[in-house]
């Protein structure tokens, strides 16, 4: 299903529902959710906190790019057996390599944005993590696209899987989609000319980074847009 269709909720809610019924090992990791980026891991963790607010389910987010204090906090959550572990592949492998993480009781293994993980080169990491998991488990892959490499991964780590596809959503009829092929230095000029032709009342502009957002904002102020 496409990005933004609720795939994360579609995996968190059923898992929490199952855990709330009981029958799963206490003080053990029961679910591992893999995320391609730290930002997505943080987002899933926030949603997890919201969905599980009134449930006796614990979670820990494990992702890179932090100091030693954060690493120790992750270690504590992993060794105490948080019900749900939300992790980026590289960071989880770092903990696994130190020998204190037990994934032998995991019942649910979820790959969120599996296509992005493969695009970022995490295929070998995923296969390495799978080796720590029990054979008797439910494995679920969520992906916006289904290229050949995703289908191959599914055949490798899934057992007789069911494939569910949601129809591709289309923009409203009144929306006009246009693509401009240009150099980086030409982008602001193109936007300026578009605004001069027809000044819009409301605009949403997406940028690739926080720094780029600041640069674009400053440029627009200079242009008095």
Residue ranges and their predicted role:
Residues 1-225:
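Conserved helicase RecA-like core
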